[in-house]
Design a protein with these regions (language model features):
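Short, well-ordered beta-strand elements
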Residues: 26-35, 88-91, 113, 148, ...
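C-terminal motif of bacterial Sec signal peptides marking the signal peptidase cleavage site
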Residues: 16-17
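Short, solvent-exposed loop/turn elements at domain surfaces
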Residues: 37-44, 69-72, 100, 158-161, ...
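Gly/Pro-rich hinge or "lid" segments in bacterial periplasmic/extracellular proteins
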Residues: 66, 168-245
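N-terminal lobe/hinge region of extracytoplasmic solute-binding protein
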Residues: 32-84, 115, 219
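Sec-dependent N-terminal signal peptides
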Residues: 5-13
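Surface-exposed binding/hinge segments that line
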Residues: 129-201
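Aromatic- and charge-enriched surface segment that lines or borders ligand/interaction sites
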Residues: 78-124, 149
């Protein structure tokens, strides 16, 4: 089992102590980072340290090569193709991507993730405009659960890749009752859906700080999971034994 421990850089004494006590016979990597993340909520936090840890615990449809600055397919089979008017883009998920419980990732997870990212009831006002200014809708292919398309509101140079930046979340975990199935993207974007008590309760739960701090609530498609978080001291990531990648 491989572990990564991220120590928050508060004092040299603390770091020295931790390193000396570390058992070098185990597959453990210790990394020193300057501060703890503001949280590890899939959508509501937005610090650099969060993004760093998410590079191990979460996955997006597309990845960005930091040397060439070119996008590459991560959860999808190839880069999206586009319609003639460059407003609709077509994706196909890899068939080997699975959640930790063994469930296959499908277009339903992508549609759900996009709806939550765009919804004004999600506490992500710092990044939501990046997405709801471009994305008009995400639609499932009726003949293939791994295929879906995204339509942009207008021709935009970020339209082809914008959906690829959302951390994909498991619909069956977050929305087992299909609460969002009958809420359209149009209703979400113009805020015309009915805010029922059930929906308000769902967002109160989803936005709760526990979903950014408690290890058991931090779900993702990455090769590691958060096994321990000691506030202001360290975060421990443990390698998944049966990761799909």
């Amino acid at each position: 089992m491989i572990k990564k421990i991220f120590l928050f850089f508060f004092s040299l004494l603390l770091i020295s102590s931790c390193v000396k006590k570390r058992d070098l016979s185990t597959n453990t990597v210790v990394a020193h980072i300057l501060s703890q993340p503001d949280g590890l909520h899939p959508y509501n936090n937005n610090s650099v340290m969060r993004s760093y840890i998410f590079s191990y615990t979460q996955k997006t449809l597309l990845g960005l090569d930091l040397e060439s600055l070119d996008y590459y397919p991560r959860l999808i089979t190839e880069l999206p193709t586009s319609s003639e008017d460059n407003k609709t883009f077509f994706f196909e998920l890899r068939d080997d991507v699975k959640w930790d419980d063994g469930e296959q990732v499908t277009g339903k997870d992508v549609v759900f993730s996009a709806k939550i990212m765009l919804c004004h009831l999600t506490n992500n006002s710092q990044i939501r405009p990046i997405y709801n200014s471009v994305i008009k809708s995400v639609k499932l292919d009726p003949n293939n659960p791994l295929k879906f398309s995204m339509t942009a509101q207008d021709i935009n140079w970020t339209a082809k890749t914008i959906l690829g930046g959302i951390y994909i979340q498991q619909k069956s975990y977050w929305d087992p009752n299909g609460l969002f199935d009958n809420i359209s993207f149009e209703q979400i974007l113009d805020r015309s859906f009915e805010e029922t008590d059930e929906l308000s309760d769902w967002f109160n739960d989803f936005n709760h700080a526990d979903n950014g701090y408690k290890p058991e609530n931090l779900k993702g498609l990455g090769p590691y999971y958060v096994s321990e978080w000691e506030p202001s001291q360290y975060v421990t990531l443990t390698r998944k034994e049966n990761w799909w990648g």
